[in-house]
Structure formats: C-alpha cells, structure tokens
Design a protein with these regions (language model features):
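Conserved nucleotide-sensing/catalytic segment adjacent to the nucleotide-binding pocket
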Residues: 1-43, 142-221
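N-terminal low-complexity, Ser/Thr/acidic repeat segments characteristic of secreted
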Residues: 90, 121, 255, 259-265
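Accessory recognition modules or surfaces
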Residues: 106-113, 119, 167-172
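Glycine-rich phosphate-binding P-loop
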Residues: 109-110, 119-143
Length: 265
C-alpha cells in the first residue's frame, strides 16, 4: 500500500477491502494467517539478500570508479552528444523515470523488447562492474538540454543510479549490458566501460573482484529463491481469498478510476 502525500488533493484512497465477504473469510482464517506470515518472511529474506548484494556492488564501484575513469567517460559522452544529439527547436526535454528491469521470482530480468520497440539504434555499454551511471547521466542531461524527451531507467538494485537511457524521439537508446543480462542483439555501437578502468588496478584486484562477483551472484540467487517461495505462498493465499471476493465490484471500481483518469487527460 502506498500512502498518498496529498489525499483528496492529488491522490485518494481506494478501499478494496469493501469487496471482501468477511463472514466467508472466517472459515479459512487459520490458513490465511499461516500463509500471510510465511510469505512476508520470504520477502524480508529476499530484501536482505538484495541489500547485501547491492553493498558488494557499491564496494566494487568505489574501488574502480576513479576520477580518471570518470574523465574518460565524460570525454566519450561529449563525443556521442556532439555526434548523435542535435539541438531541438523548443524548450528543454521532459524526463520520465521507468524501471526496465527487476529481480523477480524468475530471476533478474530486463524488458529489452521495450527498447527494440522504441529505438532502432542501440548503444550497448558493456559494464560488468556497474560504473556506467555517470556517463548515462551526462548523456541524459545533454539530450534533455537539447530539447529531447528521455526515459531514464534506474537500476533495480540502485534506484538512484541510471542503468539505461531511451530517447524515443531520436530512436536512440543506451543500454547497460552485463554478463548476466547482455543486450541480446547486435548493437549499433558497443562501448566497453570496463576497459576504461585502470588496468593495473584491475590486475591487482582480480581476486577481490572475482570473490565479490561470486558472492553477489549467490546472494541474488538466494533472493530469487526466496521470491519464488513467496510467490508460491501468495498463490495459495489467492486460492483462499478468491472465492470470497466480489470481483464484479472490484472491476466496477477499476472502471470508475479509469474514467476519472481519462477525464483528466
């Protein structure tokens, strides 16, 4: 549940609890309470694992993302902007944030199909160490300043960091490719972000980086397993709840909300 910041002014509460058959639910009380407790515990374990994996990634990034690397990224971004991003006629572009990927019960996923549907030209930023954010931020800022709308796609593990950038008006995208989730097609251009790192530092840190990668992958796998368990328990919850929900009333409420939103567009 998301609490509205300005109830009645910008947002409003939607009470779907009125759609329950409360008397009928009493007959499955014990089963509901058991499933509810179990699946919440699985989610908590998954979140702890993902938090730990993110902290390991932060440690790797702090090691490799030196000022010299950021300078190389900035120079490369300036070259791309001068070549690909032409100044528009109007005001600054509009930015929206959308997650393109997630860690789910099926594993780590990314909807690259969305990129293909919106953009013909795709730059793949090959980035096994999670360093591409400064470059993507500079590209996004340049595109917006030139008057182009942008879709900023944050990382699921690091929501304050960009992982992908889509510029549909230019049919141009910049996607981060990793060993776990590489861009599945032949890219328009490929940029090896890892090649910008200090070679001597990479060599000295090889064992540390290998260990970090192994532990991080294990933590994500454990999180995925916990999410799969949570989904199984949630599916059982739905089996218990569904016979006691007035779905006609649910759909009627949904249509009312859709009509209200459509009228405001």
């Amino acid at each position: 549940m998301v609490e509205p910041k300005y109830p009645g002014l910008v947002e409003e509460y939607v009470n779907l609890g009125a759609c329950y058959d409360r008397e009928g639910l009493q007959g499955v009380r014990d089963g509901l309470m058991g499933c509810m407790k179990g699946y919440k515990g699985c989610y908590q374990r998954a979140y702890r694992c993902l938090t730990a994996a993110a902290q390991i990634g932060e440690d790797v990034r702090a090691l490799l993302l030196t000022p010299a690397v950021e300078a190389k990224m900035s120079k490369r971004a300036r070259g791309i902007l001068s070549r690909e991003i032409k100044k528009g006629d109007g005001d600054a572009g509009r930015a929206v944030r959308r997650f393109l990927g997630a860690v789910t019960w099926k594993g780590a996923l990314c909807n690259f199909e969305t990129v293909e549907a919106l953009c013909r030209r795709v730059y793949e930023l090959s980035d096994p160490y999670g360093m591409a954010h400064p470059m993507l931020s500079q590209l996004a800022a340049g595109a917006l300043a030139a008057g182009h709308d942008a879709i900023l796609c944050p990382s699921p593990l690091y929501p304050d960091r960009l992982e992908h950038l889509l510029l549909p008006g230019l049919s141009l995208a910049f996607v981060t490719g990793t060993p776990a989730l590489p861009w599945p097609k032949r890219p328009y251009r490929r940029i090896r972000v890892d090649a910008m790192a200090d070679a001597e530092l990479l060599h000295r840190s090889r064992a540390r980086l290998k260990f970090s990668r192994k532990v991080s992958a294990a933590l994500v796998d454990e999180a995925v397993d916990s999410l799969a368990q949570a989904k199984a328990m949630h599916d059982e919850l739905e089996k218990l709840y569904n016979p006691h929900v007035d779905f006609g009333r649910v759909y009627e409420t949904a249509e009312e909300i859709i009509s209200s939103l459509t009228a405001q567009m």
